[in-house]
């Protein structure tokens, strides 16, 4: 039996070698490799700005109420895109209406958007929540507005100053049945009271009103500072000089200085200020695509190289007639500067809450 063992081992070895050769010589199955088709390039942003700038010879005429601004390429004048219009890096939204370009609908390029309204933060006053831009009256003496998380209030009682010098003993008292306090003048009976009376009989004679409002104390507040330090802005005041003797808000356009002129270049050598700047040529006023019917050569307040600021010192209000390319014309009241002076008493005219320091504190407004 010993001779059988070597033959058995040899047979097993031959079988193993045969299996290995069969595996090595058998054909290998082919593996299919999938190559995806090239995708369309959707992340490439189109070029809306071209350099050098190519602008038309004359700026476009914008519809009434649409601002004429410089495009996003800082090249040409365009009519600003309005709410709901498409916008790009060149065709920008109207900044004077608080609009911005929302690119969220153009992912992933973020090239073409839609003009949307800026949504601000609401306010909370005395436990009551108000939305951004909402106006409200916490009491009968104040009218407040919520502006992006901050509450600004203006007084409704138009008696900020005591009577004039003819009143020797003025007193600020509460009148039963009325919200606002009033000045009472305990004058000497021998001294007649000389009030500034507005007799509206002239209005009645012209047919403007049906009833007479005699013994109306005329009141006109000073004009507020211009809403912008350069360029076109708005100034307001309160006046009851009307047929009803009712306090109404009046507004006028104002332009303290041009934004596109470097006034510092006109300051004389050795000087630190230029109080008044006046352009050499007369030009037309423009407003929302409409042009004034005549040319003007206005004076502007200048600038200083130190910490002083220049504000109007002598001014008046003029009426300017505008003519629109399509539609009827209109007229607006405009600030006309005669003289300016420069001092260190400066404040930002855009700070609508600066006057609140002279008003009662928060507790009085909230209560």
UniProtKB/Swiss-Prot annotation:
Highly expressed in kidney and lung. Lower levels in heart, brain, spleen, liver, skeletal muscle and testis. Expressed in low metastatic melanoma cells. The lineage of its organism: Eukaryota, Metazoa, Chordata, Craniata, Vertebrata. The gene is Ccn4. Disulfide bonds join 49-73, 53-75, 55-76, 62-79, 87-101, 93-115, 273-310, 290-324, 301-340, 304-342, 309-346. It is found in: Secreted. Pfam families: Cys_knot (PF00007), IGFBP (PF00219), TSP1_CCN (PF19035), VWC (PF00093). Glycans are attached at residues 86, 143, 284, 343. Keywords: Cell adhesion, Disulfide bond, Glycoprotein, Proto-oncogene, Secreted, Signal, Wnt signaling pathway. Residues 215-260 form the TSP type-1 domain. One of its GO terms (cellular component) is cytosol. This is CCN family member 4. Its main location: secreted. The keyword Metal-binding does not apply. GO terms for biological process: bone development; cell adhesion; glucose homeostasis; negative regulation of chondrocyte differentiation; negative regulation of fat cell differentiation; osteoblast differentiation; osteoclast differentiation; positive regulation of inflammatory response. Residues 121-186 form the VWFC domain. Residues 273-347 form the CTCK domain. The keyword Lipoprotein does not apply. Residues 1-22 form the signal peptide. It comes from Mus musculus (Mouse). Belongs to the CCN family. Residues 45-118 form the IGFBP N-terminal domain. Downstream regulator in the Wnt/Frizzled-signaling pathway. Associated with cell survival. Adheres to skin and melanoma fibroblasts. In vitro binding to skin fibroblasts occurs through the proteoglycans, decorin and biglycan. Suppresses tumor growth in vivo.
